[in-house]
A protein has these predicted regions:
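Beta-sheet-dominated scaffold domains
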Residues: 187-364
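A short beta-strand motif characteristic of beta-propeller blades
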Residues: 72-75, 117-122, 178-184, 222-227
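Small/polar beta-strand repeat architecture
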Residues: 2-85, 113-121
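Hydrophobic or amphipathic alpha-helical targeting/insertion segments
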Residues: 95-99, 103-107
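Beta-strand initiation motifs
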Residues: 112-118, 170-177, 217-222, 262-263, ...
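Hydrophobic alpha-helical hairpins/lids featuring a short glycine-rich hinge
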Residues: 91-93
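N-terminal beta-propeller domains
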Residues: 47-76, 107-109, 127-211, 296-312
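Secondary-structure transition/turn motif
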Residues: 26-34, 101, 111, 298-300, ...
Length: 364
């Protein structure tokens, strides 16, 4: 109901938490009266939190020895990193599937129009996963690093993954009459990333590479290990180009063309000697097909956000580096120019050549 010109059927920002059961919002205009109460009951729907902007060490109590350094000083020996918010995005037909790192999975239905918001997949889908990927050939949705009990986030297993029934976003319980199922990878401590490749899905842990292939009923998908000691450094640090996979590891660059190979890199020491390992999960990979180049955007050791790029020409086998902050990159497959994003919430139309051309940012 409208009370004194105030319409509560709107979107608001919470400006103050009063106590455990109440908060304050600010309306965009003044009320036309001074009614103290009324208007009936209110049902509120909340957006998810934006998550941390940067990764930080999780300095737990008891790190290092008693009396080391000064009170309140963070101890750099902590091995726990609290990752910045990352998203995985993929198409399921015309719709968008989005998963927040260690969070829920959401569907944006394009038929509802651009002003509608993405919604949760519902109560039958896992409540927490590391990331998602759609098998476009078989029309299954994969959730990696997900829950062994779909309703319990505390059962999230970083090496466990599920796939939905074919053509379904809500059927995750395996049955004799569907193709839903699950598998677990053995080598590593967590699944880091995955890309679709020719005839299979390539999945990396922090230690190894695995291939996921469709095998039909009753198992639907099977897995086999393709490489060891060749883990992925970040969720978005791998890419497939014409059936060959290229990725950035913790201390070297690799490729897979049927066999895992460590790539000779003339700038390897320059990159890894000045890399922020705290913020390594921000690393993003893209390909510029016009110039046969793969780019890895990464944060330098003194940065909290991406500020550099290392580039590999996969036809010439050459490398170079530069200073450029991009958080994602899409080559000019669909649009006239490549499209990229940067940390200040801008969408950037990149020039196809850098000579005398300035990239134009657009707010998003």
């Amino acid at each position: 109901n409208v009370v004194d010109g105030i319409e509560f059927n709107n979107e608001f920002e919470i400006t103050e938490i009063v106590d455990a059961s109440s908060y304050k919002i600010t309306y965009s205009s003044n009320a036309t009266g001074s009614t103290a109460s009324g208007g009936g009951s209110v049902t509120a729907t909340y957006q998810i939190s934006v998550g941390p902007a940067t990764s930080t060490y999780g300095y737990g109590w008891g790190v290092l020895t008693w009396g080391s350094s000064t009170w309140g000083t963070a101890r750099a020996s902590s091995s726990v990193t609290l990752d910045a918010r990352q998203w995985s995005l993929d198409n399921f037909g015309e719709d968008l599937i989005a998963t927040a790192l260690n969070g829920g999975t959401y569907q944006w239905d394009t038929s509802s129009g651009p002003t509608t918001r993405a919604v949760s997949l519902g109560a039958t889908a896992p409540v927490a996963s590391r990331f998602s990927l759609v098998s476009s050939d078989t029309r299954h949705l994969f959730l990696f690093g997900t829950c062994t009990d779909v309703t319990d986030a505390t059962t999230q297993d970083d090496l466990f993954f599920r796939f939905s029934d074919r053509e379904s976003l809500t059927q995750w319980a395996p049955k004799a009459t569907n193709e839903a199922g699950s598998l677990r990878i053995a080598d590593g401590s967590r699944i880091i990333g995955a890309v679709t490749s020719t005839g299979q899905i390539l999945v990396w842990t922090d230690q190894s590479l695995h291939g996921i292939q469709f095998v039909g009923t009753p198992y639907t998908f099977g897995q086999r290990q393709l490489g060891a000691n060749c883990g992925l450094i970040a969720q978005h640090a791998a890419i497939d180009v014409s059936g060959k996979a290229y990725w950035m590891g913790d201390d070297a660059f690799y490729m897979y063309d049927g066999v895992v190979k460590k790539m000779p890199c003339s700038v390897q020491d320059y990159v890894y000697d000045d890399l922020s390992y705290t913020n390594k999960n921000d690393i993003a990979c893209g390909v510029n097909p016009e110039f046969n180049e793969i780019m890895w955007y990464y944060p330098s050791s003194s940065a909290t956000q991406i500020d550099r790029v290392v580039v590999y020409n996969y036809l010439e086998g050459t490398w170079y580096t530069s200073t450029l902050g991009r958080t994602s990159y899409l080559g000019n497959y669909t649009f006239e120019n490549p499209i990229a994003t940067q940390y200040d919430t801008a969408l950037v139309a990149n020039a196809t050549t850098s000579t005398g051309v300035t990239n134009t940012p657009y707010g998003v």
